[in-house]
A protein has these predicted regions:
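Primary mode marks residue(s) on the alpha4-beta5-alpha5 output face of response regulator receiver
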Residues: 23-202
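Bacterial N-terminal signal peptides that target proteins for export
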Residues: 1-10
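Intrinsically disordered, low-complexity Ser/Thr/Pro-rich tracts
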Residues: 5, 14, 25-28
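Bacterial N-terminal signal peptides
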Residues: 9-17
């Protein structure tokens, strides 16, 4: 009887330790699924396909949306240090096309406008010039480390040519204006938490 009880305790301890390891192992499928799916509201993220850091599907979805890390830097061996660094994005099928084209340095070919959620924000972009990964290399005054936001990827980026490009007034604005990657940034609550100095002042 005691042997059975001890065996059960060993099994439970093993399962709990394995679960805790997976939760703390940022390269694990479990961590990535939880982190990337939370880039969108749960009614989208919970049913989306999840792409892991090595490019493989780690969970097949059912709603046509795809969530994955948006950080263009190489996937670290031990995973991203936190969900903000991962820059996860949840995209509809048109926004997936946009992301793939952007990562490849090509012009997006969309059938219609696309939508992308990034509720954990990003680690910083030059608002005027695509592909700048460090603040020191950015256009003066144009670096923005975003908090939670939604993005609209237009089929025709030139339709945004006359749109506001100022990220400091709280309104939706265009990022990468007058380029093939122009898109609308729609700030939501908490957008300025990583860059307080850009928040509108009362």
């Amino acid at each position: 009887m005691n042997k059975v009880l001890i065996t059960k305790l060993i099994i439970v301890t093993f399962l709990l330790s394995t679960s805790a390891f997976a939760a703390n192992n940022h390269a694990s499928n479990e961590w990535q699924i939880d982190a990337y799916s939370s880039a969108a509201p749960s009614f989208i993220g919970d049913f989306a396909t999840i792409i892991g850091g090595n490019g493989e599907v780690i969970r097949k979805g059912s709603n046509g949306w795809t969530c994955q890390a948006g950080n263009p830097r190489p996937f670290p061996k031990n995973g991203w240090k936190d969900v903000h660094e991962a820059m996860p994005a949840c995209s509809d099928k048109e926004a997936v096309k946009w992301m793939m084209a952007y990562m490849a340095g090509k012009k997006p070919q969309l059938d219609n406008d696309g939508w992308m959620w990034m509720l954990h924000g990003d680690v910083g972009e030059d608002n005027l010039k695509a592909g700048v990964l460090n603040k020191k290399d950015s256009t003066p005054g144009q670096w923005i480390e975003s908090g939670p936001h939604l993005m609209l990827m237009p089929k025709d980026p030139s339709s945004l040519d006359n749109m506001n490009a100022d990220f400091s007034n709280g309104a939706p604005y265009v990022m990468f204006p007058k380029t093939i990657w122009a898109h609308v940034m729609i700030p939501v609550n908490g957008y300025y938490k990583y860059q307080k100095e850009s928040e509108p002042i009362k």
